[in-house]
Amino acid sequence: MKKLLSLLFLVVVSVYTGYAQKITFSPQWSAQSQFAGYYAALENGYYAEAGLDVSIVHPANSYGSINMLKDGTSDFITCELIQAMMASDEGTRLVNLLQTTQHTTLVLIAHDKDIRQMSDLAGRRIGKWKAGFSEIPTILDKEHNLGIEWVKFINPLNIYISGAIDATLGKSYNERILFSMSGVIPGSLLRLSEMGYDYPEDGLYVSEKYFKKNPELCRKFAEASRKGWEWVRNNRKEAVDIVMKYVKETNVSTNIYVQKWMLEEVLEMQEDVKGEAPSYSLDATAFYWLNEVMLKHGYLSKPVDFQRLTGGKQ
């Protein structure tokens, strides 16, 4: 019976694929559980059912997903809200189709167990990514006159272990897990979301031009992607197996234990309120706060329009 159902599924998918719109999708990083919903949507045939022939192409470390959208390599991408807002401000107008992370995953991983609150960061040497993604921590530093000495890194683990810094920025679904898996036990861990600096991060984006030209196609891709994430939420073990397939295909150095832990954190950060089903919508209040603070500190030259960024759907 299972073989018959599998055969029927393949026949249906083949029929859909024959008339499908070809699409290239690029997540903002290498294969990992952060993008499990998109992998699941492809593997379970949700894109095919929507009449979409989707290829997933991961970016190179030195060439991000927004660049792939700009040069036409990709039709749909994921990126963080801050990067989408700054790109829009610089002339690359993006439209948010799905908001998959409602809270910031930024954390401060500290050596000293006495670093328990914001004021304890004053005058400390703290690592941050050379590639960026540190706008809000920098704003926090300025707004509270902490006088943090920022030290740029490529890999936070080595500089942290060396003792050259007092703490490092990291992601709760990534660096925090990697530190633990490497046997590094921090003295303390502070979440920016608990320090008054919470905001949405990952979302699904498309160029405004593509959105206006293909509104129905964009709707189908977003709905199929959401269906993929909903399946992942209810089938976590199987979802990690799918993630590991992409990990192996793209030769990413990780393991199933890291990806299991990562998936749990990613799914929790999708919830507007802990324990409730995700809305997958961009919260207007959080957006306007981010808009204001980024404008105030020079990361935007003008306010980003919420209705335009969300394609007028909110």
What are these regions (language model features)?
Residues 214-297:
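Secondary-structure end/capping motifs
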Residues 82-83, 155-252:
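Pocket-lining segment of extracytoplasmic ligand-binding domains
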Residues 21-153, 157-170, 192, 198:
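Short, glycine-/small- and polar/acidic-enriched structural segments
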Residues 147-150, 187-189, 249-264, 301-308:
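Short, surface-exposed acidic
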Residues 4-16:
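Sec-dependent N-terminal signal peptides
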Residues 19-51, 284-314:
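N-terminal hydrophobic or amphipathic helices and topogenic motifs
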